[in-house]
Amino acid sequence: MDKTLSREEAKQLMQLLCLDMSCWGNLPLMRRQYLVKCKEYHPDKGGNEESMKLLNSLYLKLQDSVSSVHDLNEEEDNIWQSSQIPTYGTPDWDEWWSQFNTYWEEELRCNESMPSSPKRSAPEEEPSCSQATPPKKKHAFDASLEFPKELLEFVSHAVFSNKCITCFVVHTTREKGEVLYKKLLQKYQCSFISKHAFYNTVLIFFLTPHKHRVSAINNFCKGHCTVSFLFCKGVNNPYGLYSRMCRQPFNLCEENIPGGLKENEFNPEDLFGEPKEPSLSWNQIANFALEFDIDDVYYLLGSYIRFATKPEECEKCSKNDDATHKRVHVQNHENAVLLQESKSQKNACTQAIDRVIAERRYNCLTLTRKKLLTKRFKKLFNEMDKIVVGERKILLYMASIAWYTGLNKKIDELVVRFLKLIVDNKPKHRYWLFKGPINSGKTTLATALLNLCGGKALNINIPSEKLPFELGVALDQYMVVFEDVKGQIGIEKQLPSGNGVNNLDNLRDYLDGCVEVNLEKKHVNKRSQIFPPGIVTMNEYCIPETVAVRFEKTVMFTIKRNLRESLEKTPQLLSQRILHSGIAMLLLLIWYRPVSDFDEEIQSNVVYWKEVLDNYIGLTEFATMQMNVTNGKNILEKWFE
């Protein structure tokens, strides 16, 4: 700054800026004051024009001078760069060195000559009086450089940890140790605290009645150690650390409890903090959702919170009708109470649903379709143990079998052929078309098959721009049903028109199953997979050839008056949704097909249910049911009068 303005000019500028000379060189401050004074001295603001001109000239001169000084310094700094200096010992370096010393040759030359010292006569040999150099004294050990190595096995080495503990050790200077000993005892109401000397430093060991983070203790101690060194550690083995600090090279200075810390005198709560309160187990909720294959957040939440009721006060448990419910209720009661009081109920259930979806996707990618179908049948058998109980229920399900037999005389062969189609999943041989007039039984049979195999029903009569998210429902599903697809032209004019057939024509890759297609859901990334096989149901619409060739089989339905009349007189089949259930279709296979047609894993279940059905109804009684269906009567007229 001395090279920028003269002394007089500098004083004059600082006076105009109304700053003391001690602020000379504080360029940011001078800049702010310059802007303030410009407004004050400006003629338009009523200021002095001469003062304004002088201020501008001096300040601009200062700026130019400062920039020129900086440029000069940069040039001086960049005269020689390390990249320009050759390697030492090479001819290039010798040449560079001679050039570098050219400018200094005259200034550093010395022409003086030293007079030669007079020659001394050779002294006579005298006994040597020299002695060995005494050994250097060892420097005193500085214990402030690192935490004592003797204690490392007892403390935590975590750098960043949110874990809360109750036992700590602090390493600092002797002076700060005196202060911190009292401050820590007062601040945290320590249940035990002791001070130990270690060379020229101090270690403070203490136990707190409540849990704290190591960072919280460290920050408190730092407030009293702005210059002095400080190490703060969490202790994993409290008694081991204390006993080690009572032996050399450590010395016990003082402690708040006479006699010190004894191994058996402290409860676990004193050493490791208050006992941990039971917390909500998200994993237990996920296991419950996996066991019952629940993929609905709100249904899972509602079902699980029911377990918060005490098992002895639960109606289902007291009836002893469902052993599974009682077992699950007892296992999940305590966790359900915690869920009921939790503020993250939905988050816990959402994670459980994610586990169910993840398990389903894993099975789809690793198990064969035959294994998946067998697993589905096992689930239905478990449901049958709870639902198909007692004579009345069994007769209702047998009535549904009689009704399906009236729909198609070879209904069992039709179902077996469809299951083979679904399991094989051959490209271009993966879909059946159920076609017929209104109220002919298409949707009833399609829904029963869907519930037998597991899957979703899709509506593709929507606009094409909404179709991707509707198709995304088929992610990880075993099969699908395109329900009630509408076309543009129908055999009967009263049929409404729709986009279904047109959309179906644009989904050839989905129907063929030759290539993977992209499926997407909201808030889920797109995923490529072979679209699942299934069924298409529609009324009597005209189908383009490009769509018709993609159906492996077309099943034509006709209106049968006796079927409608028998259903009207046996309303339980519809009101209890027995006809649409997968259990009814599985019992149909058990009734008609031999045991050998089933997978070996479930043949024992098939044998059991064949015996159950034979105990409640024989061939004569079943023939009576079929006759009632044919005549349009109440199917269970003989039993339920």
From Swiss-Prot:
Q: Which residues carry this modification: Phosphothreonine?
A: T133
Q: Name the keywords, alphabetized.
A: Acetylation, ATP-binding, DNA replication, DNA-binding, Early protein, G1/S host cell cycle checkpoint dysregulation by virus, Helicase, Host nucleus, Host-virus interaction, Hydrolase, Inhibition of host innate immune response by virus, Inhibition of host interferon signaling pathway by virus, Inhibition of host JAK1 by virus, Interferon antiviral system evasion, Isomerase, Magnesium, Metal-binding, Modulation of host cell cycle by virus, Nucleotide-binding, Oncogene, Phosphoprotein, Viral immunoevasion, Zinc, Zinc-finger
Cited SUPFAM superfamilies: Chaperone J-domain, Origin of replication-binding domain, RBD-like, P-loop containing nucleoside triphosphate hydrolases
Q: Pfam families recorded for this chain?
A: Polyoma_lg_T_C, T_Ag_DNA_bind
The record lists ATP as bound by G436, P437, I438, N439, S440, G441, K442, T443
* Molecular functions per Gene Ontology: ATP binding; ATP hydrolysis activity; DNA replication origin binding; helicase activity; zinc ion binding
Q: Where, by residue number, is the motif LXCXE motif?
A: 108-112
The record places domain SF3 helicase at 410-572
Tell me, which GO biological process terms does this entry list?
Answer: DNA replication; symbiont-mediated perturbation of host cell cycle G1/S transition checkpoint; symbiont-mediated suppression of host innate immune response; symbiont-mediated suppression of host JAK-STAT cascade via inhibition of JAK1 activity; symbiont-mediated suppression of host type I interferon-mediated signaling pathway
Modified residues annotated as N-acetylmethionine in this record = M1
* Catalytic reaction annotation: Couples ATP hydrolysis with the unwinding of duplex DNA by translocating in the 3'-5' direction; ATP + H2O = ADP + phosphate + H(+)
Reply yes or no: does the keyword Zinc apply.
yes
Entry text on domains: The J domain is essential for multiple viral activities, including virion assembly, viral DNA replication, transformation and transcriptional activation. The LXCXE motif specifically binds to host pRB, RBL1, and RBL2.
Q: What does this protein do?
A: Isoform large T antigen is a key early protein essential for both driving viral replication and inducing cellular transformation. Plays a role in viral genome replication by driving entry of quiescent cells into the cell cycle and by autoregulating the synthesis of viral early mRNA. Displays highly oncogenic activities by corrupting the host cellular checkpoint mechanisms that guard cell division and the transcription, replication, and repair of DNA. Participates in the modulation of cellular gene expression preceeding viral DNA replication.
Could you identify this protein by its name? Large T antigen
The organism is KI polyomavirus (isolate Stockholm 60) (KIPyV)
